[in-house]
Amino acid sequence: MSKQQEHNKPISDRIKIAVYGGNGFVGTRVAEALVDRGVCAACLSRSGHKPLHLKDQKWSETARWCKGDASDPDTQLLERMDGLVTLVGSPPLPTFSKQAYDQQVFVNGTTNAIAIQRAGEAGIKRIVVVGAQIPFFMRRESFGYAKGKNIALQAAEDFSKLSSEHRAVVLQPGMIYGRRYLESGKAIPLDKIFKPFSWLMPWQFVSVEKV
C-alpha cells in the first residue's frame, strides 16, 4: 500500500505504533518517519509533552504525544497498538558507583525489556528495538551500558520465540549524532563536532538525519 493510500485512511483504520522514547533525540526522527508513512504514532514519554523545537513542524501535529513509562507500561494502551518501537536509553558514559551502574543497566536494558514483555502480553506481534553497535573493548559486564543493551537484545529474542507470528527487529547503529535540543527548545549543534568523525569512521557514526 502506498503512503498516500495509508494517509487517506481514517485514523481508526491506520496502523498504530507505540514509540517508547518517542520525544527524544532519535525517537522524534522515528516518529516523523512513521507519520510520513501514514502510521498513527503514539509517542510515549514520562512527560507526555511534545518537544518545543517541534512546535512549527507539521508532522508533529499528527503524532500523538502521550504520557507513558516504559518501565511500567499501560497495558490497555498497548492492547490498542499494532506494533511497538522501543528506544529508551542513556548515553554510554562510564560509571563510578554501583548506583550509577545499576541505573545504566536499568535505563538501557530493564526498561526496554519490560516494555517488550508487556507488548507480548498485550497481543502485539511486531516490535522494533533500537540498540547500539558497541565497540569490542566496551562489550563487558562491568560496563553498565553494554550490559543493559544485552538485556534488551535478549528480551527481543525471547519475544520472537513466543510464536511463529511474533517478529522482532533489532537495529544496532553506531553512534548517532546530530543537532540536539534542550527542553527549552534551544539547539546544541553537536552535529558540527561529530560530523568530521563520520568521515573518518563512517561505520561507527550515523547522522540522525538518516534514521
Label for each model-derived stretch:
Residues 10-37:
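N-terminal Rossmann NAD(P)H-binding glycine-rich loop of SDR-like oxidoreductase domains
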Residues 16, 82-83, 126:
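Structural motif
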Residues 40-47, 98-152, 162-169:
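Conserved Rossmann-fold NAD(P)-dependent oxidoreductase catalytic core, especially the SDR/UDP-sugar
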Residues 49-50, 56-114, 118-121:
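NAD(P)H-binding glycine-rich loop region in Rossmannoid oxidoreductase-like domains
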Residues 91, 131-135, 174-177:
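Active-site segment of SDR-like NAD(P)-dependent oxidoreductases
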Residues 102-103, 141, 198-206:
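Glycine-rich "substrate-gating" loop/helix at the edge of Rossmann-like oxidoreductase active sites
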Residues 111-112, 202-211:
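Substrate-positioning beta->alpha
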Residues 140, 166-195:
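Flexible, glycine-rich beta-alpha linker
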